[in-house]
Amino acid sequence: MDISAGIQASLAGRYASALFELAAEEGVVTAVESDLDKLHAALGESDDLKAVTNNPEISRKDQASAIEGVAGVLGLSPLTTKFLGTLAANRRLSKLGDMIRAFRTIAAAQRGEVTADVVSAHPLKDDQLESLKTKLTAREGRTVKLSPTVDPDLLGGLVVTIGSKRIDGSIRTRLNTLANAMKG
């Protein structure tokens, strides 16, 4: 299995690669990816969960029991639950977001997909996301999976990042460009 050296070079990448290889051996890559999506959503919604994963003052044991409880509530697979326990034992839960991103990248690469991070000022409607996905798929020549987020600071427009390519059509950038041009 050919996994990018760039991903493996990071701590998060090494953990994500190990999880991917275990999931592939057990034939549960899709289930683990679904688990990580649930976990990512929970991290985004719960300040308490973020605090548990990022607070170094919480003991390993308390982190492990809290994360085990979260895994139970979310209905995560045994492999994902064990992985989270390992992260807690090794004090690596603070890197969970990076590990989720790295796992998604590895899984998408294995499927021949690319992930496009789409940042917009307001939540995009389903038809807008589908239209964007169609256009990006045509442009990239392979299946594009969208990962939408909202950043009100953009004011309007979109910023799309696919790998190292960035398409910035945000109003914020246009205003900054105009301001710099006016400064002379």
UniProtKB/Swiss-Prot annotation:
| Coiled coil regions, renumbered to chain | none
Q: Carries keyword Transport? A: yes
Cellular component terms (Gene Ontology): plasma membrane; proton-transporting ATP synthase complex
Check the record and name the Gene3D superfamilies matching this protein: N-terminal domain of the delta subunit of the F1F0-ATP synthase (1.10.520.20)
Q: Reply yes or no: does the keyword Aminoacyl-tRNA synthetase apply.
A: no
Extract the SUPFAM superfamilies matched here: N-terminal domain of the delta subunit of the F1F0-ATP synthase (SSF47928)
* Molecular-function GO term, any one: proton-transporting ATP synthase activity, rotational mechanism
Q: Which family does it belong to?
A: Belongs to the ATPase delta chain family.
Task of the protein:
F(1)F(0) ATP synthase produces ATP from ADP in the presence of a proton or sodium gradient. F-type ATPases consist of two structural domains, F(1) containing the extramembraneous catalytic core and F(0) containing the membrane proton channel, linked together by a central stalk and a peripheral stalk. During catalysis, ATP synthesis in the catalytic domain of F(1) is coupled via a rotary mechanism of the central stalk subunits to proton translocation. This protein is part of the stalk that links CF(0) to CF(1). It either transmits conformational changes from CF(0) to CF(1) or is implicated in proton conduction.
Task: List, alphabetically, the HAMAP family matched.
Answer: ATP_synth_delta_bact
Q: What is this protein called?
A: ATP synthase subunit delta
